[in-house]
Structure formats: C-alpha cells, structure tokens
Amino acid sequence: MMILSILATVVLLGALFYHRVSLFISSLILLAWTAALGVAGLWSAWVLVPLAIILVPFNFAPMRKSMISAPVFRGFRKVMPPMSRTEKEAIDAGTTWWEGDLFQGKPDWKKLHNYPQPRLTAEEQAFLDGPVEEACRMANDFQITHELADLPPELWAYLKEHRFFAMIIKKEYGGLEFSAYAQSRVLQKLSGVSGILAITVGVPNSLGPGELLQHYGTDEQKDHYLPRLARGQEIPCFALTSPEAGSDAGAIPDTGIVCMGEWQGQQVLGMRLTWNKRYITLAPIATVLGLAFKLSDPEKLLGGAEDLGITCALIPTTTPGVEIGRRHFPLNVPFQNGPTLGKDVFVPIDYIIGGPKMAGQGWRMLVECLSVGRGITLPSNSTGGVKSVALATGAYAHIRRQFKISIGKMEGIEEPLARIAGNAYVMDAAASLITYGIMLGEKPAVLSAIVKYHCTHRGQQSIIDAMDITGGKGIMLGQSNFLARAYQGAPIAITVEGANILTRSMMIFGQGAIRCHPYVLEEMEAAKNNDVNVFDKLLFKHIGHVGSNKVRSFWLGLTRGLTSSTPTGDATKRYYQHLNRLSANLALLSDVSMAVLGGSLKRRERISARLGDILSQLYLASAVLKRYDDEGRNEADLPLVHWGVQDALYQAEQAMDDLLQNFPNRVVAGLLNVVIFPTGRHYLAPSDKLDHKVAKILQVPNATRSRIGRGQYLTPSEHNPVGLLEEALVDVIAADPIHQRICKELGKNLPFTRLDELAHNALAKGLIDKDEAAILVKAEESRLRSINVDDFDPEELATKPVKLPEKVRKVEAA
C-alpha cells in the first residue's frame, strides 16, 4: 500500500501540473492529501511537518523573494542577452494572436473556431467581379514580360482609374478602404494571371507611403498626399534597402543631417540627405519617394539628442538631386524596380513623415506597419499563383497522354501533383487565417513572418513540381505558357521583406520566443526595471508553466494525446489531440533551450530555426482545421485536410527529432527525448494512397477542386492560358466516353489523338451523331492547343538583333 500511495501522490502532483492549478491551491491540496494519508494510517502524520516547511517559503512572498527570487533575479540579469534598440522596437511592435496560444502549450481550439470568418462586402465583391476581372482580361503576361518589360499604358491607366493602388487608403481620402481579406483576394486573383500585375498593385498597398501616412502623417501630409495617391496621380515607392544593408536593415548607412538651408528662396530648418538605395519597387517611375535614413542633429537644432536614429521622410522625386529612372532586371519578371541615389539633397524638416516630432521614430514606424503588409501581400501573391497553377497542372495532367493514358494516372506524376494540391489548400488556409487577425485589429508580427516564409517557400516548391510535371509545356515561353514566369520569379518572393533564410533562422522563433511566451518578455522588463517584486510573481508562474508542459508532454506522448480535449468528434478529432501534444512539446523545448543556451540561442540559428519550424507547422495545421470548419466541414475536402495536417505533424516531429539530435547539451537532450518521445516517433508523411486521392481531385471538375481555385481568374480569354486549360479539360472529359464507345464498337484501343479524323470516320459509319462528332472536333482543338507550345521568328526573340557582317566581294587576280 505504501508504494501505491506514493504512486498516487506522484499522479496527483502530475495532475496539478497538467491542469495548471495555482501554487496556493496546489499547496492546500497536497497538505490535505498528506493529512488524509496520515488519517488512513498509510503515512505518518509527521510527514506534514517537512512538507509544510517546504511549502511555506513558496507561498509566503517576502520569504520566497529573499530565499529564491532575489538570487535568481541577479543571475537572470547577468545572463539576459543584450538587445539593441532596433531589436527591442521589433519585439515591442505588433501584437500576439493565435500563435501565442500555440506557443503556450495548451491551445484553446474553441477560441480559434469562434474567430469570425471574414466575408466580402457587396462593394468588395463587385470590385473583384468587375474591375479586377477586367484587369485580368487586359493583362497579357507574355507581352508584359517579353515585349514591353512593363504593364501596357492602357492597363496602367485602368489601374489608376479604378483605384487599385488605394485599397488601404481610407474613403475620406478617396480610397477604397478594403478589408485585409478583400486585399488578399484581389492580389490572389491578379497573381494567377501575372506576377508583375500583382506586384505592381500589391506594393503600394503594403508597407509604403500610403500606410505610413495614414498611421503617422500630419494632417497636412495626409490631406495633400492621400487623395493624390488614391487617384494614382502620385506613384509611391519606399526606399529602405541599400548595398550595405539588406536583411540587416537597421544598419542602413544612408544619412541625414539637420541643418539650415535655402528652400524656395528662404532659409529654413531642414535636412541634408545622402543615400544609395537599390531593389526599390516602383522607384524608376515614382513621383514621391519614401526614404529611410539615419538622422543626426549635431547642432541640436531640434533641441534633443545628436543621434536621432532611423527616420522616414517623404520626398517628391522632382526635388533637385533625387536620382531615379534606372531599372534592375529581376529574373525576367521585369516589374518596375531599380536604384535611387541622392547626395547632399536638402529638404525641409517637415518632409519627415509625421513632422519633426517623429524624427528618430522610423524603425518603430516600419516594424509596426511591416507585419500587416508582410502578412498580406507576399503570402497572397504566392498563394494566388499556386492556386491557378494547381488547376492548370491538374488539367494538363488529365489532357496530356503518354502510353495511351493520362499522365495524371501515373504514380510518378501523382506524387508531385498531390503536393501541389495539398500546398495550394494549406497556403490558402494560412494566408486567409492571418487576415482574420488583422481584421480584428491585431498586428501579428511573428505570424506574418511564418506566413511569409511558408507561403513563399511552398509556392516555390509547388512551381518546381509543376514544371517537373509539364516538362516542355512549362519550359517553352510564349503566349500559351502558364508556368515559366512564375518559375523564374519564385526566388523574388523568397528574398524580399526578410529573406527566407533569415526569417526561418532568426525571426520566427527569435521574435516568437520573447513575443509569444507568456512570461519572458515581462521578466525581461522586470529585470531591466530592477523590479524584483514583479519578477518574483512571474518567476513562479513561469516555473509552473514549465512543470505543466513537462508533464503534459510526457503524458500526451505516452497516450498519443488520447486524453486531451478536442472541439469535435469527427474525422479530425485526433488531429486536435496530436496538436495539443506538439504544442506542449514546443513550449517545453523553448523554455529548456532558453534556460540552457541563454543569450547564445540568438547565435544558434539552426536550433532557433527548428523551434520556429515546430511553431510554423502548428500554425499551418490549425489554419487547415479552421478552414475546414469555416467551409462547412465538407467531407469531400477531407483528403486535402488529411494531407495538410499529416504533412504538418510529420514535419513538426521531424524538426523536434533533429533538434534533439543536435542539441549541444547531450544530457539534457537525452532527458528531453524521454519526456517528448516516451514511446518513440509516430507521425508519417502522407501516404501513397492519400496522394492518389488528392492528385485525383485536381484532374476532374468537382466542388473540392473549385474550392482550391476559389476566386481565381478562370475565364478562357485570349491571353489566359489557365482559363483555356480549364475549358480544354471540360471539352476532353466530354469527349472521353464518346471515344471509349467508338473503341468498343470497333474492337480497338485507339489512341486519344486525331479526334477530328475519328469523328469524321465514325460519323460516316453511323457510330455517332453530329452533336457527338462536334464534341470530338472541339476536344481535339482544345487538346492540341493545350499540349502545343509557341515558336518564333528569330527576330522576335532578340532585343538587339545580331548584325551579320556584309560579305566581302572576292577580287579575282588578274
């Protein structure tokens, strides 16, 4: 009985930690339990004495502070990693949303499902059905990329007329004031037609003058610029990146010096600016330049410090000394992008966004706004491109036949095709969920980094898979190619607004560990403020948090999550339970990593990256489950849900295993392995059988396939190869049973080619009627259009045709 009572006590302790019961209540329960065991004669009543001696200091604050918290506080202040001003501003910027729940080890799934699903307003839907549809029809991506290296003038004019550049600008200034969800849908639709079109519209609606002015501009700046930006009268760009500072944007060398100078014939207080920027989208054609630079005030003309820090100003490009116009040439996807320079350019101090009082506040302004733009524009562009590519590749895989069968029925094709379909579903779920948070007023900085990285990364991988499937059709550029420019341009999204290597290795967990953790940021603030009283309360909450996640990790690993709560009892029930387990694992691994590695964790980028991978996969899986719930839990969509969540579970577990295999403290790694994997690894990547189901969805028209491609431009217009493939898929499917019947009548397995000739012969023999013959003829036209590629006269391809030397006439000897 003694052994059983000890085991029962251990179970009780575990239950208290598991359910996160407060320290005081837990102490009372332990004392009552021990007393009950004493009354029952199982334990000596004297055990209460040492137990009370142990528990009293923990519950009596003055004693606890002097004996425990104060020494820990002193040690914490010594090992706390140094934080630069820019790092602090980045961490302080924005808010924590659903990713905070995932990070804390006990997600509230009901809260996730109660987040309201965004809906398009009638105005937003009309814009998508009208101006956006027309802009897509007008866009000829081959002409844009190969012939013009720009949007055609009539398309530029149309975008300005219909205020495409004003989606984020408030209506009081003449803007559209669309929701984040509507912006995402617009960009997805445009991206499926032309990457250049989507980038051109997306950038002014992301981080730039419009966004910064609305948040920080003076009334005079807003009244002057916002209506002009809304009408397209002004074209904005924002210059941050320089040759010496790319990912390390806080190290920009561009300078401004506060001084007096002549402006329009008068001596005014202003700034003398020198900059050298590159990779600036819309810079070659911009009329107003947003500029980030480091401002100093050596004469203290503003009355404050000398070194003011990063500042943002708005400068008309007609200002003397501003150099724009030259272009970069990014991967044959020639959107307007180029350098801008200026040397000793004098401008009034009022050109600072927000006026002189915002001098030195530029970095805070940027990071506060960046999470919104980064969370919408890049994920939406990548997602829209993949959604259209998914439909087109699925259609092509059905239409294209080799060895007398559709290539989509071959297992070698099914594997990448399933990845494309699964990624399209997951990316759309992830890109949509973050818009929910933004529409609720959140500025989820960590979540925007997750969505930016994984949508662009999965987008690139999906485009590569599509190229492998389509082969020559995807390689040969021309009017009928739906893939090659997306393939060429994929690295652009990978690189901009936080290069993906940086984002994964430093930003997701680097910010998430502090921003999403329930206690670390407040503990750091308490240490900075030398407030041991606040630190004491946080410390013991933190200790309970770690203990809870340790118990939860072990128990949920032992039971594979079977005892944890779930909001549903259907086919997705086990996924919630698995995610409960992984969330506890992440919380434990994060705390242990921070405790063992301390400030050096910032430099252990591969450890940080793997912790970020776990958090990211938890988000992607929860986004899939949220999408499935929001769309009515359609069982036909379950193959995509299974694929998305199983892929996330497998990758998260792989990241945990890799982390433990490479954890620098091998003793701690061994202990963590026992707690996290008490019965070993269990999650598998999506099976071949599941891949088969998912790949099949893309190859025939159905409701699930339509949901994958929701909102995309699928009209079979002249310059829309995706829409033409959709039309061809319907034509070929309509012809297939007629072809099979003819084969059966003739007793031959005829190839699915020359259907027009087959129609003529079968009609002559009375095997089919005229309507069926017409179906076969149309299918053959569509089939040939789908599999054929473009060819050109040599002169059409050369920007500078080679001039062959004139032949020298031979002079015969006399």
From Swiss-Prot:
InterPro entries: Acyl-CoA_dehydrogenase, Acyl-CoA_Oxase/DH_mid-dom, Acyl-CoA_Oxase/DH_mid-dom_sf, AcylCo_DH-like_C, AcylCo_DH/oxidase_C, AcylCoA_DH/ox_N, AcylCoA_DH/ox_N_sf, AcylCoA_DH/oxidase_NM_dom_sf. Pathway: Lipid metabolism; fatty acid beta-oxidation. Its cofactor is FAD. It catalyses: a medium-chain 2,3-saturated fatty acyl-CoA + oxidized [electron-transfer flavoprotein] + H(+) = a medium-chain (2E)-enoyl-CoA + reduced [electron-transfer flavoprotein]; a long-chain 2,3-saturated fatty acyl-CoA + oxidized [electron-transfer flavoprotein] + H(+) = a long-chain (2E)-enoyl-CoA + reduced [electron-transfer flavoprotein]. GO terms for cellular component: cytoplasm. Its EC number is 1.3.8.7, 1.3.8.8. GO terms for biological process: fatty acid beta-oxidation using acyl-CoA dehydrogenase. NCBIfam families: FadE_coli (NF038187), PRK09463.1 (NF007000), PRK13026.1 (NF009586). This is Acyl-coenzyme A dehydrogenase. It comes from Escherichia coli O157:H7.
